[in-house]
């Protein structure tokens, strides 16, 4: 909890209020499978954008290939959004329809 002080200029009173701080939301970045993007390109994206090892990247790629989607990582809003944009730009530059999405992670 943090203290916030409010000053009322008309009455010249200082009021102390307790404010409960809330942790910022985290976002899951999900890679989506498609029938056109080569598996090796997906592995490269996971290594380059998400800094995963080759083995981790292959596991994530296979999960997306089998189930249709896979978790790439959990990040703050700004980082997650940046990673989604990076994937979309790189895929577009290479002529692939690869997509990522981001969704709010449920609080436990």
UniProtKB/Swiss-Prot annotation:
Homology family: Belongs to the ClpS family.
Any Pfam family hit: ClpS
GO terms, biological process: protein catabolic process; proteolysis
Record field: transmembrane: none
Lineage top rank: taxon: Bacteria
Subunit structure: Binds to the N-terminal domain of the chaperone ClpA.
InterPro entries found in the cross-reference section: ClpS (IPR022935), ClpS_core (IPR003769), Ribosomal_bL12_C/ClpS-like (IPR014719)
Gene3D superfamilies named in the record: 3.30.1390.10
UniProt name for this protein: ATP-dependent Clp protease adapter protein ClpS
Job of this protein: Involved in the modulation of the specificity of the ClpAP-mediated ATP-dependent protein degradation.
């Amino acid at each position: 909890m943090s203290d916030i002080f409010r000053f009322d200029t008309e009455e010249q009173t200082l009021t102390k209020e307790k404010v409960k701080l809330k942790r910022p939301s985290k976002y899951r970045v999900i890679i989506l499978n498609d029938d056109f993007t080569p598996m090796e390109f997906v592995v490269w994206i996971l290594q380059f954008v998400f800094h995963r090892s080759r083995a981790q990247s292959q596991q994530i790629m296979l999960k997306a290939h089998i189930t249709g989607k896979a978790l790439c990582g959990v990040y703050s809003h700004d980082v997650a959004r940046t990673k989604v944009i990076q994937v979309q730009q790189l895929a577009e530059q290479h002529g692939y329809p690869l997509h990522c999405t981001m969704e709010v992670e449920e609080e436990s």
